[in-house]
Amino acid sequence: MIKKLSMVAALSLALSAQSMAAEPFTFMTNWYAQAEHGGFYQAQAQNLYKDAGLDVTIKMGGPQVHTMQLMAAGQADCIISDNMQALESWQQGVEAVPVATTFQHSAIAFLTHPDVKDKADLQGKTFLLAAEAYTSYWPWAQSALNLKNARVRPYTFSIQPFLADKTLVQQGYITSEPFAVQKANAQANVYPISDWGYPPYGNSIVCMKSTIEKRPQAVAAFVKASMQGWKNYLQDPGAGNVLIKKENLQMSDEQIAFGIAQMKKYQMVTGGDAQTGGIGIITEPRLKQTWQLLVDNKLIDPAKVPFEGSYTLQFIKDVKVIP
C-alpha cells in the first residue's frame, strides 16, 4: 500500500513539474546586443522571465536580418521594431501589432556641425540618409522641417564623410553615432527629431496578431517582466551587461556606458508618458499620430490599414512599472 502511494506521489510530482515547465518564447532584437536592449538582457540575467513561466531566447538582429519577415515566418514570437514599421507591414499582409515600447520617443537624430543652431539652419545642407529613411522619417522631415528641396546622399554607416565635410548633416541614433564622433575627438550637435514633432515610439515590442490571440498569457508575462528588467537595468546594469558582452563580443564597456548615459540624458525609457503610465507605456493618441503621418504621406492606404486593430494596449496598460 505504501509502495502504491509512493508511486502515486511520484507521478503527481512529475505531472506537477511538467505543468510548471517554462513556456518557450523567442524574442528578436533589431541589432547586435547593446545597451539599447539592456532591459531585456537584464530580465534574462535576473531570471525575471523564468519566474514569469517563460523560457525566453533572445536572438540578435543585424544589418541583413529582416526581423519582420522572420517573425511572420514563425521564427520569433515578438521583435523589436517601431509602430511605424508595424503599420507598414500591414500593407504587405503581415499583421504586426505593437504591444509596448522601450523608448518613449524615436532614437533617430540629425548630427550637424556646430554652425547649425536650430532646425532653420538645416536649409541648404546635404543630408546623409540610409535607405530606410525614405519610407520612415524622411517624408515627415521634408514636410515638417521644410526640406523638400534638400540634397541627399547615401549614408554608409561611417562618420568619416560627415567629419570631412562641414556642409553635411548625418542621420544617426542618439546612443550610437555621437559615440563615434566622440571617439574621433570631434564635435557635433545632436538634434533628436522627436523634439521637432516626429511622433513614433522607438524600439517597440511588436508581435504577430496571431501570437497575441493564441498566447495572450505568454505575451503578457513577457511584457511585464521586460518592463521590470528595464527599471532594474537603469538602476544597476551589471547583470544585463554581462549577457550583452557575451552575445556581442565587439561591445565595449565604454560604449555600453555611453549608451546608458544617453538613454538617461534624453529620458528615452523613463520620460513622457512613462512618468505616470509606467515604463513601456503606449497610448492611442500617439499611435494615431503615427498612423496619420503615414496616411498623409501616402505610405499606407487607410482602407488596407485601418487604425483600429493595428495596436493593443491590453498588455501594458496595467503593468505600471513606474521609473
Model features per residue range: what roles?
Residues 215-299:
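Secondary-structure end/capping motifs
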Residues 16-21:
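Sec/Tat signal peptide C-region and signal peptidase I cleavage site
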Residues 7-15:
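Hydrophobic helical h-region of N-terminal Sec-dependent signal peptides
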Residues 43-46, 52, 70, 74, ...:
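Structured segments of extracytoplasmic/periplasmic soluble domains
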Residues 23-164, 168-172, 191:
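Short, glycine-/small- and polar/acidic-enriched structural segments
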